[in-house]
Curated annotation (Swiss-Prot):
Catalysed reactions, semicolon-separated: phosphoenolpyruvate + UDP-N-acetyl-alpha-D-glucosamine = UDP-N-acetyl-3-O-(1-carboxyvinyl)-alpha-D-glucosamine + phosphate
Organism: Azorhizobium caulinodans (strain ATCC 43989 / DSM 5975 / JCM 20966 / LMG 6465 / NBRC 14845 / NCIMB 13405 / ORS 571)
Pfam families per UniProt: EPSP_synthase
Keywords: Cell cycle, Cell division, Cell shape, Cell wall biogenesis/degradation, Cytoplasm, Peptidoglycan synthesis, Pyruvate, Transferase
2-(S-cysteinyl)pyruvic acid O-phosphothioketal PTM sites in chain numbering: C126
Protein name: UDP-N-acetylglucosamine 1-carboxyvinyltransferase
Primary site of residence: cytoplasm
Binding of UDP-N-acetyl-alpha-D-glucosamine, residues: R102, K171, V172, S173, V174, D316, I338
GO cellular component assignments: cytoplasm
InterPro entries the UniProt entry points to: Enolpyruvate_Tfrase_dom, Enolpyruvate_Tfrase_sf, MurA_subfamily, RNA3'P_cycl/enolpyr_Trfase_a/b, UDP_GlcNAc_COvinyl_MurA
Compartments reported by the entry: Cytoplasm
Enzyme class label: transferase
Keyword Cell wall biogenesis/degradation: yes
Annotated binding of phosphoenolpyruvate, by residue: K22, N23
Length: 429
């Protein structure tokens, strides 16, 4: 099993190209199931989760062609993917594939809307909280689907098609909002989704579907209105830049006291996180090239942050911020409001010398001017990259095990960091 070895203590300086967003690419790939024509996606990141979804879509009979080669540090050099879902040969998404990634459950909406049926295994993925699929299923029921749970599979049927309806989510859910939008796009009549997620990835999905002929208004607000259409056509769409990768490298730069330009990044996608970084002492400059992050000489200031649905501070940057705050000049408080059990990185950060204690859903971080390298183990995607950030600032060697988590969400991480001066390498084993 691969490991990552880091010799910490240096600063990051240079340019890091920001990849296409995984959290946008996955629903966009799934949206191809809604059309008999080709969907061409540009700037698709090369990630384990993307490759797994290619296998899942292939299981349904979807033909996927990947073109384009990486072109140096061009921030728009992600792969181009042609997805042809003209022929659906199977509406079952099996356990052995879906159990490995929760987002793959989202195929249920498009398959049901287009084919009138779907049989999808209950999902797997990161071990952070329960993430129930109830909101997805309630939305599909509201649109007229019959839903049964049989031997670990969701069996959804709508032999006469779906019908527009009012969907009210009791709690904001990004995944369920994706499902509702895709299913409603082909439903008969009008659908109103209330308490919808407002994340940029929701907007990106809606923008792509509109290019395909969908009639959607309000994406990016809490109320989305959709007028169903009989069919969707093919389209070409570029995946938006990854705001979580952007925030991660911005925090790594602040942690090490460097000067890095995040090429291709969009500040409007993560304003809350950038505001927190400014409060922590980082200098943030936005220009035509992307976002420049600096912290030269000044200390790191403690902050108090609660995660929240967009436009609040993203839960997917909580672990990275905690790593940064281990070096702050004082006490920080970080409250997790989105997922339960998302503090599994605390114990591993403590192995590097971090002083963190938990009070319910809040982590109290006592900053220190010293971390020391040690062997640590990644527990999930975001926790693993928080250990990378801490390792970059720690004295001596940090060895991170179970780095397959990183490959799910960060493209060429070691290469991008090493080009900015980090002493980081992958050790195969």
């Amino acid at each position: 099993m691969d490991k990552i070895r880091i010799i910490g203590g240096g600063s990051l300086n240079g340019t890091i190209p920001i990849s296409g967003a995984k959290n946008a690419a996955l629903p966009l790939m799934i949206a191809a199931l809604l059309s008999e024509e080709k969907l061409v996606l540009e700037n698709v990141p090369r990630l384990a989760d993307v490759a797994l979804l290619q296998r899942i879509l292939g299981n349904h009979g979807v033909d996927i062609t990947v073109n384009g080669k990486r072109n140096g540090d061009d921030p728009h050099a992600g792969q181009t993917m042609e997805i042809d879902a003209r022929v659906i040969v199977d509406t079952t998404a099996p356990y052995d594939l879906v159990s490995r990634m929760r987002a793959s459950f989202w195929v249920v909406g498009p398959l049901l809307a287009r084919m009138g049926e779907a049989r999808v295994s209950l999902p797997g993925g990161c071990a952070i909280g329960t993430r129930p699929v109830d909101f997805h299923l309630d939305a599909l029921r509201a649109l007229g689907a019959d839903i049964d749970i049989d031997a670990g599979y969701v069996v959804a049927r709508a032999p006469h098609g779906l019908t527009g309806a009012r969907i009210v989510f009791p709690k904001v859910s990004v995944g369920a909002t994706h499902t509702a939008i895709m299913a409603a796009a082909l439903a008969k009549g009008d659908t109103v989704i209330e308490n919808a997620a407002r994340e940029p990835e929701i907007v990106d999905l809606a923008d792509c579907l509109i290019k395909m002929g969908a009639r959607i208004e309000g994406a990016g607000t809490s109320t989305i209105e959709i007028s169903g259409v009989p069919r969707l056509r093919g389209a070409r769409h570029s995946v938006l830049p990854d705001r979580i990768e952007t925030g991660t490298y911005a925090m790594a730069t602040a942690m090490t006291g460097g000067d890095v330009t995040l090429a291709g990044a969009r500040a409007d996608l993560l304003e809350s996180a950038l505001d927190v970084l400014r409060k922590a002492g980082a200098q943030i400059d936005v220009n035509n090239e992307g976002i420049r992050v600096r912290r030269n000489g000044a200390g790191i200031f403690p902050v108090e942050v609660s995660t929240a649905p967009h436009p609040g501070f993203p839960t997917d940057l909580q672990a990275q911020l905690m790593a940064l705050m281990t070096r702050a000049q004082g006490r920080s408080r970080i409250t997790e409001t989105i997922f339960e059990n998302r503090f599994m990185h605390v114990q591993e950060l403590a192995r590097l010398g971090a002083n963190i204690h938990l009070e319910g859903d809040t982590a109290i971080v006592e900053g220190s001017d010293r971390l020391k390298g040690a062997p640590v183990m990644a527990t999930d995607l975001r926790a693993s990259v928080s250990l990378v950030i801490a390792g970059l600032a720690a004295e001596g060697e940090t060895m991170i095990q179970r780095v397959y988590h990183l490959d799910r969400g960060f493209e060429r991480l070691e290469e991008k960091l090493s080009r900015c001066g980090a002493q980081i390498e992958r050790i195969s084993g």
